[in-house]
Every structure is written in structure tokens, then in C-alpha cells.
Amino acid sequence: MLLFSVLLLLSLVTGTQLGPRTPLPEAGVAILGRARGAHRPQPPHPPSPVSECGDRSIFEGRTRYSRITGGMEAEVGEFPWQVSIQARSEPFCGGSILNKWWILTAAHCLYSEELFPEELSVVLGTNDLTSPSMEIKEVASIILHKDFKRANMDNDIALLLLASPIKLDDLKVPICLPTQPGPATWRECWVAGWGQTNAADKNSVKTDLMKAPMVIMDWEECSKMFPKLTKNMLCAGYKNESYDACKGDSGGPLVCTPEPGEKWYQVGIISWGKSCGEKNTPGIYTSLVNYNLWIEKVTQLEGRPFNAEKRRTSVKQKPMGSPVSGVPEPGSPRSWLLLCPLSHVLFRAILY
């Protein structure tokens, strides 16, 4: 009887270790009438270390797209470079992981003089800003482009140096930098952010990461709509649809890939726009391809050098394909990706 009990116990332990994991429940809190579980589902295994930029090892191969009032909720690991920049624990801008020390964002997010770096934090490694598993990093330095012009938003780029390095894994991945711009390069582009999903309703703020598809426009065509457009800017939208990034998740990345399954590259930083979600009216982004040398110079001067040449990979010119998968068909319910600003916040920053 004792031997049988020992064998039974061993079989139960072995089964627990080697058997399939219990499927995770569906996610979340009720958002606009859709009831979901307390937290977003997490990956069914611990994150594994990664070093490749633009990689989405957890997300690749998954095809589920949750729609929130016609918008789209990002899947776990779909935008592992995305971060939330917060002041006194209040989200106000977005950003992206450049490497373990550096966060890339927009200068206009940090354009003032009185909030010290130690009052800022960066949240990463999660889609849900209420998740207990999110990682929070302190900021050591705020660095703005010295030629940023508030009047026309030229050179709208900034860097945050973290107080301690990020332990990169497949939920915290640096984004790649491109070597060339142009709509002919990119097959699929997205923006993502935390914020409002209805321009008229400031209470429609989300704690879950939302995403919207984008197509990069021809610069000459866009400059006819926006006379103050400079060569340091690019335009992106989704023709005949109301997808847009708007007030608030400024500083977040516009990311593209040349082919499904390949690496992702940050081609733009959410900067400004004429309106939110109007058909055939694009948003304006900082054209990141113009700033590789600036990034290298600044990071070198700050003692945490970033060598873009070692991280960039040339992407092949590809013809534009059909609209990306998971995008609602015309006529289906949808809403804008809207993002909320934080008012009356002042920053102390270094200019380079």
C-alpha cells in the first residue's frame, strides 16, 4: 500500500510538470459594454531573453484580433517595443525602446523646464497599464533635439536615458531603425497607444494598448495639404477610413515591416495633425530615418553609446500589398485611436 501511494504521488507530480497547461481565460474588465476578465491574458510561458531588434516571437503566428468599438486591441507581444511615459504615475505620452538604456519619444512631450527626470517613469513589458506584471523604470536624463521648433514642430524628437538598464526579453524588445524611407518600402504599418477611443468623450480612456493600421503617403502630395511640412516629417493615414493617432500618445512609434514575418522598423514618431480621424486627412510623424546620426551622437556624449549601423538592416523595396490582415472592412463599426495629453506639466531637459 505504501509503495502504491508513493507511485501514485510520483505520477501526479509528473503529470503536473509535463502535461499541457490549462488554457487561460478570456480577458478583462468591461470596456464600452464588452465584459472581459480582470486582466489581459499573459503569455503561457515566462519571457525568454532576446537581443534582436524588431522581433515579435510571442506574437508571430497568432491571428486573433479583438475589436473594441470598432478599434483594435493589441495582442500580447504584438508591440513589445511600446512604452508609456508617465509623470508622477500619470500617463501622458508614448515612446519606444531603442536599446536597454534608451527610450525614443517626441520633443514636444517634454518641451518645458521644470519637471525633473526623477519625476518621470517609463512603463514597459505590458499592454495593460493596470497589470501587476508591468515593469517601471526611472529616468536619469531628458534630452531634446536642440533645433526643435514648437511653431512648426520640426525636429520633434527626444531621448530618455534610463537610470538602470532594461532586461530585454520577448515582451521588452528594441525596435529596429530604417536606412531608407518611402511608402514603396513598407508592406504593413501600425501605430499603437493608450488613450481615448472617441474624440468627443474624454472618459473613453483605455488602459489597454490600442492599435490602428497606417499607410505612408507621398510627401509631395501631403505637403499640398500641410504647407508647413518639412523634410523631417512624413505623413501617414488610412485612405477612406477613420484610423488615426491623435491627441496624447504623442511620442509613440509608427512601425512598419517590408514583409509579414520579417523584422519591424520604426519609421516615424507620432507628432501632430490637423484633426483626428477624418477620412483622407493624415497624421504627421517625425521621419526617423533623418536622425540616426543625431541618436548616435547624443548617446555617445551621454556615455551610453548606441551604434545604429550595428542595429539597422537595409530593407528591400517591395510593392505595396493589399490592406493588412485584421483591419475591419469598410462599413464595419470602428473608432479612432485617440490619445490624451497631460495638462500643465513642465520639464527640465538637456538640449543636443
Curated annotation (Swiss-Prot):
EC number: 3.4.21.-
This protein's UniProt keywords: Cell membrane, Cytoplasm, Disulfide bond, Glycoprotein, GPI-anchor, Hydrolase, Lipoprotein, Membrane, Protease, Serine protease, Signal
Any one of the GO BP annotations: proteolysis
Biased composition (Low complexity): 319-330
GO cellular component, one term: acrosomal vesicle
CDD domains: Tryp_SPc (cd00190)
Propeptide: 326-352
Domain named Peptidase S1: residues: 68-300
Keyword Hydrolase: yes
Tissue-level expression: Only detected in testis. Expressed in spermatogonia, spermatocytes, spermatids, Leydig and Sertoli cells. Expressed in prostate cancer and ovarian cancer (at protein level).
Entry-listed glycosylation sites: 240
Spans annotated as Disordered: 308-330
Catalytic residues of the enzyme: 108 (charge relay system), 156 (charge relay system), 250 (charge relay system)
Protein's UniProt keywords contain tRNA processing: no
GO molecular function: serine-type endopeptidase activity
Disulfides per UniProt: 93-109, 189-256, 222-235, 246-276
Lipid attachment site numbers (GPI-anchor amidated serine): 325
Similarity annotation: Belongs to the peptidase S1 family.
Name recorded for this polypeptide: Serine protease 55
Organism expressing this protein natively: Homo sapiens (Human)
